[in-house]
Amino acid sequence: MKRSYQALEPTLFFLMLMVIWEISARMIGQPYLLPSPIQIVMRTIDLSESLFFTHLPATLAIISIGLALSIVLGILLSLLMFWNERVERAVYPLLVASQTIPVIALAPIFVLWFGYSIWSKVAVTVLLTFFPITVNTYDGLKSTNRQYEELFYTMGATKRQLFYRLFVPSTLPSFLTGLRIAVPLAVIGAAVGEWLGANEGLGYFSRRMMTQFDGPGVFAPIFILSLLGILGFAAIKKLENILLPWRKKQ
């Protein structure tokens, strides 16, 4: 009974927020400033063909390519830093420095370099997502129990066996944690990139609706972007429960 109530708590809190939002929007009475949730849903339905068949696929492509590149870059960088201390001393500060630069300032530069092609938006997405993947994977490699490593060597394991039988399983929880953080950031990166320079995508569509003072139209793609982030986060969490069942029990 207690678990059922705990599972219900987030839903009740969300519904309470929606009721407060609906009442506040009706009291203000200016949809172009603060549309109500019902108005946003109705506008999403009205614009569904354009949103779901033109702009959503464009945004999903940016998110998918950006995440894939971030995973590859993150794993390669974390392995290089783990295997070579000089690389770690040289690269790690640059990783941290890359996160101190506002993405909103770099996005126009990417548009200047890559134009309105998909790659300017992918660059923004990679900039936001590769850091948590790299750092978490590297920390996972560093936290591998050295006693287990010595035990593997004592039992005659090769370096290849050591990597796949020890380092990969011990690093997987940290990698998945980084990926879980990166997925919502990928949605943000795609939206920011589209907002600043694109001719299609949910971020672009939201900006276009803003120029028309269409409040519900501005929020409609934001609503879809939020759902994408939540679904992506939940999918990685589900993958964690499948690959790491002991963590779910804990």
From Swiss-Prot:
Residues 56-237 form the ABC transmembrane type-1 domain. Gene3D superfamilies: MetI-like (1.10.3720.10). It comes from the Bacteria. Coiled coil: none annotated. The chain crosses the membrane at residues 5-25, 62-82, 94-114, 115-135, 172-192, 216-236. The keyword Cell membrane applies. Keywords: Cell membrane, Membrane, Transmembrane, Transmembrane helix, Transport. One of its GO terms (biological process) is thiamine diphosphate biosynthetic process. The keyword Membrane applies. InterPro entries: MetI-like, MetI-like_sf. It is found in: Cell membrane. Pathway: Cofactor biosynthesis; thiamine diphosphate biosynthesis. It is a multi-pass membrane protein. One of its GO terms (cellular component) is plasma membrane. Belongs to the binding-protein-dependent transport system permease family. The complex is likely composed of an ATP-binding protein (ThiZ), a transmembrane protein (ThiX) and a solute-binding protein (ThiY). Participates in a thiamine pyrimidine salvage pathway as part of the ABC transporter complex ThiXYZ involved in the import of thiamine degradation products such as the formylaminopyrimidine N-formyl-4-amino-5-aminomethyl-2-methylpyrimidine (FAMP). Is probably responsible for the translocation of the substrate across the membrane. This is Formylaminopyrimidine transport permease protein ThiX.
